[in-house]
């Protein structure tokens, strides 16, 4: 039986996952992280993108987080997300449309505020698509 660590993935709205996992993979601001049992304590900010967990039965689940924090304690890994969603519940077509709208808004550059908002929307749409793609790749 593989070693495991307890993992909780929560957003402001709800808890999305709680259980024993063999590994948690997430995108931190300093790069990608793979957290396994026995990992050193850590606190880092998360970039928008996928968070992947491999459960003790070998099954993988993929979540999208819009950012937040990842905390590693000796027996617990916690993902505190600004917003989060199971990748299987996400709509790839809607994410593609949001990406296209954001690119179009960036090309218009009507004001600095609009540009910043469009850039943030583009980053989020691309991150959502990465989460959906990871889900497809695991199947």
From Swiss-Prot:
Assigned keywords, A-Z: ATP synthesis, Cell inner membrane, Cell membrane, CF(1), Hydrogen ion transport, Ion transport, Membrane, Transport
Keyword Cell membrane: yes
UniProt key word Membrane: yes
Cellular component, GO, one term: proton-transporting ATP synthase complex
Domain of life of the native organism: Bacteria
CDD domains noted in UniProt: F1-ATPase_delta (cd12152)
InterPro entries: ATP_F1_dsu/esu_C_sf (IPR036794), ATP_synth_F1_dsu/esu (IPR001469), ATP_synth_F1_dsu/esu_N (IPR020546), ATP_synth_F1_esu_C (IPR020547), ATPsynth_dsu/esu_N (IPR036771)
Membrane topology summary: Peripheral membrane protein
Annotated compartments: Cell inner membrane
Protein family per UniProt: Belongs to the ATPase epsilon chain family.
Functional summary from the UniProt entry: Produces ATP from ADP in the presence of a proton gradient across the membrane.
HAMAP family, sorted: ATP_synth_epsil_bac (MF_00530)
PANTHER family in alphabetical order: ATP SYNTHASE DELTA/EPSILON CHAIN, ATP SYNTHASE EPSILON CHAIN, CHLOROPLASTIC
Protein name as annotated: ATP synthase epsilon chain
Species whose genome carries this gene: Alcanivorax borkumensis (strain ATCC 700651 / DSM 11573 / NCIMB 13689 / SK2)
Species lineage: Bacteria, Pseudomonadati, Pseudomonadota, Gammaproteobacteria, Oceanospirillales
């Amino acid at each position: 039986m593989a070693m495991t660590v307890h993992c909780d993935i929560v957003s402001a709205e709800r808890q999305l996952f709680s259980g024993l996992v063999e590994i948690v993979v997430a995108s931190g601001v300093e790069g990608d992280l793979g957290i396994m049992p026995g990992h050193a304590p850590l606190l880092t900010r998360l970039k928008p993108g996928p968070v992947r967990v491999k459960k003790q039965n070998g099954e993988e689940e993929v979540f999208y987080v819009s950012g937040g924090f990842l905390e590693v304690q000796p027996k617990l890994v916690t993902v505190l997300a600004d917003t989060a969603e199971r990748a299987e519940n996400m709509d790839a077509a809607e994410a593609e449309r949001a990406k296209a709208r954001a690119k179009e808004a960036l090309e218009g550059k009507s004001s600095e505020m609009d540009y910043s908002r469009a850039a943030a929307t583009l980053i989020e749409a691309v991150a959502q698509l990465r989460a959906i793609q990871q889900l497809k790749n695991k199947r």
